[in-house]
Design a protein with these regions (language model features):
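Short, charged/polar surface micro-motifs in flexible loops or helix N-caps
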Residues: 83-90
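Extracytosolic low-complexity repeat regions of secreted or lipid-anchored proteins
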Residues: 92-168
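Bacterial signal peptide processing site
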Residues: 28-31
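Primary mode marks residue(s) on the alpha4-beta5-alpha5 output face of response regulator receiver
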Residues: 46, 50, 149-150
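Secreted/processed peptides and extracellular or luminal domains of membrane proteins
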Residues: 33, 50-51, 87, 99, ...
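Post-signal-peptide N-terminal segment of Sec-exported extracytoplasmic proteins
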Residues: 49-80
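Bacterial N-terminal signal peptides that target proteins for export
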Residues: 2-17
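C-terminal motif of bacterial Sec signal peptides marking the signal peptidase cleavage site
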Residues: 22-26
Length: 168
């Protein structure tokens, strides 16, 4: 059976167009990030393999650094595993789905959340104009929970006050 030339040309053009579209969708630029100091920690590898395909309804993006993650286009949620483990702080500490997070709003509307009481520490930067911080932290809780908690945030009510006046 002979196929008419015009049909063969249209089929070839359609196939070329489809192939081009597939290639272009796979060529989205990786989100440029720097790895954290302790990104080579094996616990970070476990976190990365458990990262969700979407966070706060934002699709996962490829990154160019070890132990990182990004979601949204442009990226609205960024993750770094292996950041410096925070010590005691006066910044607010929130517990979201069993994970303690220190909240830093110094760059609002971009909020920085860092795990407290986990080593390696994980930092999440959220553009609150694009996504809900709470939703993003809930979506990431399963991956982050792979790093065991060794301590927890304390509030003023958790710290015992001395019952006697100190002697001089």
């Amino acid at each position: 059976m002979m196929i008419p030339r015009s049909l063969a040309l249209r089929s070839g053009a359609a196939a070329s167009l489809l192939l081009s579209a597939l290639l272009l969708t796979g060529c989205a630029a990786a989100v440029p990030l720097e790895p954290a100091a302790d990104a080579i920690n094996p616990a970070c590898a476990d976190v990365v393999v458990h990262l969700p395909a979407s966070v706060a309804d934002q699709p996962a993006r490829e990154t160019n650094a070890q132990a990182t993650g990004a979601w949204g286009d442009p990226a609205a949620v960024l993750m770094h595993c292996g950041v410096t483990v925070p010590g005691p702080t006066t910044l607010p500490c929130l517990n979201v789905n069993g994970i303690d997070w220190i909240e830093d709003d110094a760059d609002a509307p971009r909020y920085r959340y860092t795990t407290y009481g986990r080593d390696p520490a994980i930092e999440i930067v959220i553009d609150s104009e694009k996504v809900s911080g709470t939703t993003a932290l809930v979506d990431l809780a399963s991956a982050v929970s792979g790093v065991p908690a060794t301590s927890a945030c304390l509030g003023v009510e958790d710290v015992p006050l001395p019952t006697e006046a100190p002697s001089l």
